């Protein structure tokens, strides 16, 4: 198995809370609150409510679905539903330098797993921080195919890391969970967005599902091939994988602190054009 993947897995599993800089912790709280607000707002979308009604009809317990009435279901389904809701309104945060909407795909696993396992708020926030770290760093290493969307790809493995962290898994166990997770990554395309296909948001929700599932598979004894991540990202869903990007400034540069918050329901490359349009319209109105 690759040295970089092992180093990242051990870092995410074993780094103490106390070593996280206070500024990073404070910023992570904002990311958590912003993402939770987006999940709640997205929960009332018609298709999200429809999926929720169908998937919670068979029962389940252990985790809250952040939606009107606060329904409960099993942690995997709750993570899926909360992730779907968060991706449905295009207000989830993103990473400035990597194609990675990490928080909305990592946090649902962290919330559902922490509730089920009765973990503390500090442990939940740490899971978000380290899950985001894994998502962004693997995303930096991944050479995406031209029309590939990041939903259900590197952020899915970030969710797996969050789930593993909350289960107090060792570095070796987290590595196994991540490599199992590599068999679950998805293949959504940006063409979904152009076509108005909201199935793209389901791929984001599935990150939460996989994040709650893969650690349990690892603990149950499921085996994974040593180079599963490198193969998946380098040859299958991706077009190359740079291992050196995974550990660049690891422990010194915290990826969650390099995010951006969305103030408009669109991806950040469009913001400058919308800002300019607003200024133009304001000038026209005053003429």
Regions found by a protein language model. Give the residues of each.
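A conserved active-site cap/scaffold subdomain adjacent to cofactor or substrate pockets
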Residues: 249-287
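N-terminal core-entry segment
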Residues: 1-257
């Amino acid at each position: 198995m690759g040295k970089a993947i092992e180093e990242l897995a051990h870092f995410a599993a074993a780094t103490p809370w106390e070593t996280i800089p206070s500024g990073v912790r404070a910023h992570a709280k904002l990311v958590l609150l912003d993402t939770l607000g987006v999940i709640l707002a997205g929960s009332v979308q018609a298709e999200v409510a429809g999926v929720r009604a169908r998937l919670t009809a068979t029962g389940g317990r252990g985790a809250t679905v952040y939606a009107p009435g606060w329904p409960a279901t099993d942690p995997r389904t709750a993570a899926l539903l909360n992730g779907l809701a968060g991706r449905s309104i295009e207000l989830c945060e993103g990473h400035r330098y990597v194609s990675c909407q990490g928080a909305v795909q990592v946090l649902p696993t962290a919330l559902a797993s922490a509730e089920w396992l009765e973990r503390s708020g500090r442990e939940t926030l740490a899971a978000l921080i380290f899950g985001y770290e894994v998502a962004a760093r693997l995303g930096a290493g991944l050479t995406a195919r031209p029309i590939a969307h990041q939903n259900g790809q590197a952020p899915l493995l970030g969710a797996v890391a969050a789930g593993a962290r909350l289960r107090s898994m060792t570095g070796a166990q987290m590595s196994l969970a991540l490599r199992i997770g590599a068999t679950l990554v998805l293949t959504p395309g940006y063409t979904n967005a152009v076509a108005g296909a909201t199935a793209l948001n389901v791929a984001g929700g599935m990150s939460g599902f996989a994040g709650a599932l893969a650690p349990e598979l690892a603990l149950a004894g499921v085996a994974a091939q040593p180079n599963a991540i490198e193969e998946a990202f380098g040859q299958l869903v991706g077009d190359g994988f740079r291992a050196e990007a995974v550990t660049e400034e690891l422990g010194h540069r915290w990826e969650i602190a390099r995010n951006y918050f969305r103030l408009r329901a669109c991806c950040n490359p469009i913001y400058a054009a919308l800002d300019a349009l607003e200024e133009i319209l304001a000038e026209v109105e005053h003429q």
